[in-house]
Swiss-Prot record:
Record organism: Yersinia pestis
Catalytic activity: GTP + H2O = GDP + phosphate + H(+)
Residue ranges of the region described as G5: 174-176
Biological processes annotated in GO: translational elongation
Subunit-level organization: Monomer.
Predominant place of localization: cytoplasm
Intracellular or extracellular location(s): Cytoplasm
Gene name of this polypeptide: tufB
Protein name: Elongation factor Tu-B
Stretches for region G3: 81-84
Annotated region described as G2, given as residue ranges: 60-64
Catalytic activity, EC: 3.6.5.3
Length: 394
């Protein structure tokens, strides 16, 4: 097969390996890069290059993550792998590495283990939309019935957390044997790559989604009106279009009468651009930082939601002591802090630094939000936690 040259024109998809410690996530990551490089071109990455993951900071939290890239004939993949369980928890909650799909690695020799379950649950909570299963170490299991049993257990576990367990692709392989160049097991890596291509749909690009701009600043320009500035998070805003100002106070409808970037006038502002948007007839006092400018009807303000949260450890600069129900920190969404109270799950009395926990939050002012929105938890401007909206309640 000819090596095809790498082209930026291929669609790009973000994936990652999840699963229990020592089930072979990093070995599989190395095997994918090695087998695909050999088959389709690209560069292989050795196990130890992936395993000593560099530290990164996301929302003030230190996370160890390895990033690798590989190609199939159809797509370009960016793939994340984390060395430790805590890194996965932090990564998934902060959204440091947003996944369009995940590869759940389960050792056939062990079957599903506690972190297998925890990663599936986290995937559900933080909005990982698709999971593909790689049953690893199958070369070490001679009994076909045992493999059937493990596969069934994994499918049931996925279904328990509202993933389509019965329809999930399950590939039986051996990452180590594939990495060693054994053709029978290399074929299973190609099968996994084909499952990634066919089972994970092409993610919607930010530019194709409804317009949203988190407001960072508000100015009044005499004779022209009010200008709000910020970076367009998604979609496009065109001059002459109606927009809504959502959050904190009652939603207001207005019209975009101008877009400018670097003092130049434009017809539109697009996802990723820092722009100023001129609003017709809107008073300076009607708008504030922390609100969003959005396509009418595309996003609503909410005050109560269920969330999945990671609380920084003392070493990470977090709290030194646990907190209890009735805790009232600030929740930082996009560009502003809003005070809120928390409700802990049944049977959870307190939360220790370094824990992750599911909690219900009640904000004192509404924020424009959808499921999947990330936030920081702060005390007096210092970050003490990170979270994600798992489900809007009201």
């Amino acid at each position: 097969m000819s090596k095809e040259k790498f082209e930026r024109t291929k669609p790009h998809v973000n994936v990652g390996t999840i699963g229990h410690v020592d089930h072979g996530k990093t070995t599989l990551t190395a095997a994918i890069t090695t087998v695909l490089a050999k088959t389709y071109g690209g560069s292989a990455r050795a196990f130890d290059q992936i395993d000593n993951a560099p530290e990164e900071k996301a929302r003030g939290i230190t996370i160890n993550t390895s990033h690798v890239e590989y190609d199939t004939p159809a797509r370009h993949y960016a793939h994340v792998d984390c060395p430790g369980h805590a890194d996965y928890v932090k990564n998934m909650i902060t959204g440091a590495a947003q996944m369009d799909g995940a590869i759940l690695v389960v050792a056939a020799t062990d079957g599903p283990m506690p972190q297998t379950r925890e990663h599936i649950l986290l995937g559900r909570q933080v909005g990982v939309p698709y999971i593909i299963v790689f049953l690893n170490k199958c070369d070490m299991v001679d009994d076909e019935e045992l493999l059937e049993l493990v596969e069934m257990e994994v499918r049931e576990l996925l279904s328990q957390y509202d993933f389509p367990g019965d329809d999930t692709p399950v590939i039986r392989g051996s990452a180590l044997k594939a990495l060693e160049g054994d053709a029978e097991w290399e074929a299973k890596i190609i099968e996994l790559a084909e499952a990634l291509d066919s089972y994970i749909p092409q993610p919607e690009r930010a530019i194709d989604r409804p317009f949203l701009l988190p407001i960072e600043d508000v100015f009044s320009i005499s004779g022209r009106g009010t200008v709000v500035t910020g970076r367009v998070e998604r979609g496009i805003v065109k001059v002459g279009e109606e927009v809504e100002i959502v959050g904190i106070i009652d939603t207001i409808k207005t019209t975009c009468t101008g877009v400018e970037m670097f003092r130049k006038l434009l017809d539109e502002g697009r996802a990723g651009e820092n722009v100023g948007v001129l609003l017709r007839g809107t008073k300076r006092d009607d708008v504030q930082r922390g609100q969003v400018l959005a396509k009418p009807g595309s996003i609503k303000p909410h005050t109560k939601f269920e969330s999945e949260v990671y609380i920084l450890s003392k070493d990470e600069g977090g709290r030194h002591t646990p907190f209890f129900k009735g805790y009232r920190p600030q929740f930082y969404f996009r560009t502003t802090d809003v005070t809120g109270t928390i409700e802990l799950p049944e049977g959870v009395e307190m939360v220790m630094p370094g824990d992750n926990v599911n909690m219900v939050v009640n904000l004192i002012a509404p924020i424009a939000m959808d499921d999947g929105l990330r936030f920081a938890i702060r005390e007096g401007g210092r970050t003490v936690g990170a979270g994600v909206v798992a489900k809007v309640i009201e």
